[in-house]
Each structure stands twice: as structure tokens, then as C-alpha cells.
């Protein structure tokens, strides 16, 4: 069982990775299988990440999910098939207990990190709660988000750095935030790929800089980061599973120094 005490160990590195959203069972299972193979070989604890729905899209016709229950059942199947814990986002208070029946970690999106009722609902499930730092917040302000969860009697908190707004269409990572948030006594996660988003594009779809993934990961390691989120989108035309296998090997190898 995934426990927050195990994740707090200074020498523990673990990886949260998977598709941005659950788009179909075959894709999710194949991605999980590839990453489990890689992380088992490198002896890295792994948590499968996949949103069962995406509620924070720019356009009303953007993809949001395949159906809540269908996607949650896929997350449960991945956990049972591969023996790995799972994490998914929640967006509303009623999502908390529903998702908690299927996954091990509830994740609070960055845009929602100050929503008290949502944080309280997540805390009351007794699950680990990963709160992503809002692009508009200082690292030190995240202590208040964490305290809302702790005050509910749940000390299973993780905090995630995912970049800070830098103008209208870009993000920048201030790596001072990693050691600053670690002083609160909770594991700090580095969301490598979302830190490279370029939001507010004229197309209504966020862009990104995937060629800088390794740079962001290496810099986080130097900042005493030991936990990473890596996710991919299937919007590209190439084989998602093949691409994910290659990208995961490169990413994991970068941060642990075991693969060229």
C-alpha cells in the first residue's frame, strides 16, 4: 500500500506518469504496461496517473472524458492488473468520495488549490491528497492549502510544483519553491510536463515545450526534488504507446542517471 511515510523518505524517488486523461482502456493498459516494465527494471516506485475527466478545458467542445464510471473502472483495472497505485484529479466536492473508491491518491488541480470545500472533501476520504500549486501562488502560500487538509485529520499530503504564470502565454519554474515547500514537512512533487505548458494559445488548446523535459527534470533533482509527474497527450498522430515507451525511458533515465 502506498503510504505518505514511505514517500517522505529523503532517499525515495518515485514516478507519477501516464496519459493526461483516460481516453480508452487499450491505450491506458498499454501505457501502464510499458512504464511498469521500465520502472520495475530500474527499481523505481511507480504511481499510474490518469484523469478520469478533464473539467478545465478552454473550449466547450474540447475532449473531457469517456464517461466517469467507465474511466474510473479502467483505473481500478490498472491497479489490479499491474499492482501499482493510481492517482486521478477531482474537480468538485462530490467527486472526492466517488473517485476514492477506485484510486489511491486524489489530486487537486492547480486552478482549484484554494477551493476549501474541495480540499476538505478530499481530506475526508482518508486518501493521500496531492495538491498542485496554483500558477498564481507563491510556494510559501501552499502551507495554507496543506493545513486545510491536516485540520481535517488527514496528514497524507503531497504538494506539487507546476510552474508560475510568466506573461499571458507561458510558465516559468522558480526552483526555490521546491526546498521552500519541503520545509512544510510534506513530499514535494515536480510536474515536469505541465511546467512546460504554454497556455492561452489562440487555438484554444495549450501548447508546450516537450524538448525541455529533461532540462526541467535535471534542474528539479538539483533542487532536492525526488518525485516527478510525467504525462503525455495522445493528440499527436504517432503511436502513443511506442512514443510513451521511448519518452518514459528517456525521462526516467535522465532523472536517475541509469539510462543514456
Indicate where each model-derived feature is located:
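N-terminal amphipathic alpha-helix/helix-capping segment at the start of soluble metabolic enzymes
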Residues: 1-16, 73
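Short beta-strand segments at enzyme active-site cores
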Residues: 15-16, 44-51, 85-90, 190, ...
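Glycine-rich, proline-tolerant flexible connector loops at the mouths of alpha/beta enzymes
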Residues: 16-27, 46-68, 232-243
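Catalytic beta/alpha-barrel core
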Residues: 66-67, 81-95, 104-117, 128-139, ...
Amino acid at each position: 500500500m502506498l503510504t505518505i511515510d514511505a514517500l517522505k523518505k529523503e532517499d525515495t524517488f518515485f514516478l507519477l506518469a501516464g496519459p493526461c486523461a483516460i481516453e480508452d482502456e487499450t491505450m491506458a493498459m498499454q501505457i501502464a504496461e510499458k512504464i511498469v516494465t521500465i520502472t520495475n527494471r530500474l527499481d523505481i516506485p511507480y504511481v499510474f496517473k490518469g484523469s478520469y475527466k478533464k473539467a478545465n478545458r478552454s473550449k466547450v467542445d474540447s475532449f473531457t472524458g469517456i464517461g466517469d464510471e467507465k474511466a474510473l473502472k479502467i483505473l481500478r483495472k490498472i491497479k489490479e492488473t499491474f499492482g501499482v497505485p493510481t492517482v486521478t484529479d477531482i474537480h468538485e466536492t462530490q467527486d472526492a468520495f466517488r473517485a476514492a473508491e477506485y484510486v489511491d491518491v486524489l489530486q487537486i488541480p492547480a486552478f482549484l488549490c484554494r477551493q476549501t470545500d474541495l480540499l476538505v472533501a478530499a481530506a475526508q476520504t482518508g486518501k493521500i491528497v496531492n495538491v498542485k500549486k496554483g500558477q498564481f501562488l507563491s510556494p510559501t502560500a501552499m502551507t495554507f492549502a496543506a493545513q486545510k487538509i491536516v485540520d481535517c485529520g488527514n496528514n497524507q499530503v503531497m504538494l506539487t510544483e507546476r510552474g508560475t504564470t510568466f506573461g499571458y502565454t507561458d510558465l516559468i519554474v522558480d526552483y526555490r519553491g521546491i526546498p521552500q515547500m519541503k520545509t512544510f514537512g510534506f513530499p514535494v512533487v515536480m510536474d515536469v510536463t505541465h511546467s512546460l505548458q504554454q497556455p492561452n494559445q489562440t487555438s484554444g488548446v495549450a501548447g508546450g515545450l516537450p524538448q525541455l523535459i529533461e532540462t526541467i527534470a535535471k534542474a528539479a533533482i538539483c533542487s532536492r526534488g525526488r518525485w516527478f509527474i510525467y504525462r503525455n497527450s495522445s493528440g499527436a498522430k504517432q503511436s502513443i504507446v511506442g512514443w510513451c515507451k521511448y519518452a518514459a525511458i528517456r525521462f526516467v533515465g535522465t532523472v536517475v542517471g541509469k539510462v543514456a
